[in-house]
Amino acid sequence: MITSTEKTAIMAENKIDYIHKDFKEAWDLPSASMWVLTNKGDMVCVSKHPDVYELLEAEDTVRSVMGFEFFAVLTCGWAAPIDDLGELGDLPPSKHKKRRRVRLVVGSDYDGVASVIRFQDKPDETVVDAGMARGSLADSIVSLQKRKALAETADVMTEIKQLLEGETNE
């Protein structure tokens, strides 16, 4: 059964794919980008960085995704098949003889994480993963979601404190 996070990630990836259809370098983007889903249903790019991990770890990124129920990171790279044991092996995907160029959207909301992979050699096909991904990118997305939740909670606590202080000053 498809989760709500998967549905949102698929919709987000389709919107981002539509935006990138006419890009000359749609499979070799110079920067990873952070996108948010607005209340109007639009995907809006809020930040970019040449290094996807630095983008995900930046405090500015936390602030840029606060207040939005869904955010997604877009990046490009190489994918390679996993072995029969489900392992990637020691060879980096970029060096694998069966490597494929991909554009990856990893989205997150309060219910989970989902990713959508689009392959350059078959751009009309996608592979959707409902939070089963593992590795440093998946860990970084989960970390960003946690930091976002903590920052939003801190903002709410500050607002409550200000309201309570306002009541005692009256």
Label each PLM-derived region with a short phrase.
Residues 40-42, 79, 111-112:
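Short loop/turn segments at secondary-structure transitions that flank enzyme active sites
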Residues 94-170:
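Glycine-rich, aromatic-bearing surface loops/beta-hairpins
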Residues 30-34, 68-70, 92, 99-104:
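Short, surface-exposed beta-edge/turn micro-motifs
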Residues 1-64:
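N-terminal domain-onset segments
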Residues 56-96:
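Short HxH-centered metal-ligating active-site micro-motif
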Residues 45-69, 125-143:
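A signal for specific C-terminal beta-sheet/loop modules enriched in small/flexible residues
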Residues 28-38, 70-77, 169-170:
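Short glycine-rich, low-complexity/disordered patches
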